[in-house]
Amino acid sequence: MEFKHVSVLLNECIEALNIKENGIYVDGTLGGAGHSSHILSNLSKDGMLIGIDQDQDALKAAKEKLKDFENVKYVHSNFYNIDSILNDLDIEKVDGILMDLGVSSYQLDEASRGFSYMKDAPLDMRMNRENDFSAYNIVNNYDEDSLYKIIKDYGEERFAKRIANFIINRRIEKPIETTFELVDIIKAAIPAKMRREGPHPAKRTFQAIRIEVNSELKILNKTIEDGVNRLNKGGRMAIITFHSLEDRIVKLKFRELENPCTCPKEFPMCICGKSPLVKNIAKKGIAPTKEEIEENPRSRSAKLRVIEKL
């Protein structure tokens, strides 16, 4: 299957990065290289793009899309490892970092990946298929309390306790092996009236399991800190999020980096000595235009946040 992915907030990202033609830029989620192709188009031959992705399918597609560009370094890894990646490339500082935290259209549409509740497939959801740990392990091995906590915290699902209980009871009979088996269990756990209203009843639970499989939220804070430390003065970090949990983490971390002072509020002046590391470029975040949402409905929940290194 062809790797298809429509880049979200494309023009906004390119503008936000404030690209220098001879700069070094990192795309931490290379994907189908939609954003990266536009970054490269703004670079001279003296500039460089480092494309990171943990999905080999994505890297293969990106190499094909960017085959006419020579100033690209491809890295099969997770953006969590940005420090060691730059060390291995003997690069100390960069001028911009982009991270698009969404699941690609390809990953959703490729049934075998097990990300979608709309297509039947083995329970998988691994961004990096070289890892052994998958959705199957969570659904069939986690105890009821752990399942409840994940579905509640990562999915913000109001029926998390019932869903966890129904999963436990079903797997007593036999292992839960496919996405549609899990969807049926979730539907049975949610009251009929609630199933008829709002988004697909499995959406939040699938999101929660995917986040747990790929440790998505656990790695964000460290990645932001390490990335900011690697930015040149005036360099920018742009992050696209797709749900409130991610956005909250990014917003709070950006706020902390902009105002790291730990002095009590009643102190008339700062004595902790911690000075701001960044300037927030888009405090409220940047949302897609109405036109973009109409063209690409999956962009509806996207939000772009941007900081600049001081």
UniProtKB/Swiss-Prot annotation:
Pfam (any one): Methyltransf_5
Any single biological process term in GO: rRNA base methylation
Broad class of enzyme this protein falls into: transferase
UniProt-recorded Gene Ontology molecular function terms: rRNA (cytosine-N4-)-methyltransferase activity
Predominant location category: cytoplasm
EC number(s) given by UniProt: 2.1.1.199
Compartment(s) of residence: Cytoplasm
Catalytic activities: cytidine(1402) in 16S rRNA + S-adenosyl-L-methionine = N(4)-methylcytidine(1402) in 16S rRNA + S-adenosyl-L-homocysteine + H(+)
UniProt: S-adenosyl-L-methionine binding residues: 33-35, 53, 79, 100, 107
Keywords: Cytoplasm, Methyltransferase, rRNA processing, S-adenosyl-L-methionine, Transferase
Family matches, as PANTHER family: 12S RRNA N4-METHYLCYTIDINE METHYLTRANSFERASE, S-ADENOSYL-METHYLTRANSFERASE MRAW
NCBIfam families linked: 16S rRNA (cytosine(1402)-N(4))-methyltransferase RsmH
Protein name: Ribosomal RNA small subunit methyltransferase H
Source taxonomy: Bacteria, Bacillati, Bacillota, Clostridia, Eubacteriales
Gene designation per UniProt: rsmH
